[in-house]
Amino acid sequence: MNRRRQKRPNWFLISLLVLLIAGFTYMDRFIIPTYQSPFVPTATATPPPEQYITQAQELFNQGKLSQAIDAYKQAQALKPNDPSIYVAMAQVQVFAGDYKDAQTNSEDALLLNANLSEANAVRASALDWQGNYLDAEAAVKHALELDPNNADAHAYYAEILTDEYLTGSGTSTDVLNTAIAESKTALTLSPNSLEAHRARGYILEATGNYEESIREYQAADKINDNIEDVHLQLGSNYRALGSYDQAVEEFGKANTLNPADPTANLLISRTYATVGEYAKAVQYAESAVKAVPSDPNLIGNLGVMYYSNVDWSDAIKELSLAINGGTTDDGQKVTSIQLTTNTHIVEYYYTYALVLAHLNRCSEALQIAQLVQSRVPSDATAMTQASAAIQICQKNLASSPTPTPVSSSKGKTTPVSSAVTSTPIPLATPTP
């Protein structure tokens, strides 16, 4: 019986199969996991929070405060339990004028670490800028209890005390001298601190030492020349010294850094009014109102500038809106501004009385003039202007005038008594 012959294996096919299996295995383990499909977005690594913090600091130095705040928010999202990020962001928010948000972030930092001196200090500064001086003073004192060598806290304390001195709201019996001492301590502890130089400049400005104040603000400006507030303060000091061109230049720099803030345009308008350039004053006052159309203070200032430019119809429109409240042409609600001892608000009221008198609306003019006389009897300028409004009305009544149309600079016609078409009573030099 013959044995069946066995078929010999095909070693070539076997080898090929083994190679194919090995190749597929290699691709599965090493090639496919690293392959990037052109149809799938490429994954990017999330930057560490430190990268965002560095970016925020660079943006702050460039004066890009809103972008710096956004960078801190990104760092905060990655590291939500780090109180130092909250504090750093709050400091920038104070410079940016976001005082409520600065207060919130400093308080959030304190929730993470109640004994953080810098968080208490920044909270104090935010409260100070909101006019809450008593709570600000309590917060900064606690910051100094936690760290007596906190230079920023000493600087903020000096500014808080200066505000208390200027508003007469301080509890200390020697507010001014304490503020001076605190500003000097801040500079001793940190001679290269922007906050320390700013605080020292502020107390010098408050005490009328304008040239020394300018030097301190210039020192702050050398540390960072992209801070709006420093340029505003420099401008105010130059204006107080009568250096109006330099004042306008500094206000212009401030406006460039933060065009959304109407403060610089407001101050430029008042500076031009001081030197009698009323057309320019009107231009910048209008720009300020465009930035915040519902602000009665800006509207009142615009009314004063219209009056100074002998544009009574527009002056009365703006002053009435500021003092009585109402709605702007584009539908924004304006809350009436109440008469206080603030020199600018007083100016809005007596200017309103004057323009009412010039337009022979004497019943209203007398009410406003008498209100000014009863509320601010110690303000000599206000008394003079209120009396002038009353005298105009007395002349109007005595002359029995015939209405005469007068066109404003914007082409509007307003019936005005022939007895009151003379040049308006000049206002006092606007208060810095």
Sequence positions of predicted segments:
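Alpha-helical segment of the N-proximal tetratricopeptide repeat
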Residues: 45-84, 88-98, 129, 166-170, ...
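Register position in tetratricopeptide repeats
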Residues: 61, 95-96, 129-130, 163-167, ...
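Structural marker of alpha-solenoid helical repeat scaffolds
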Residues: 78, 112, 146, 189, ...
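Canonical positions in the second alpha-helix
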Residues: 74-75, 108-109, 142-143, 185-186, ...
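Helix-start (N-cap) detector for alpha-helical repeat units in TPR-like alpha-solenoids
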Residues: 49, 83-84, 117-118, 151-152, ...
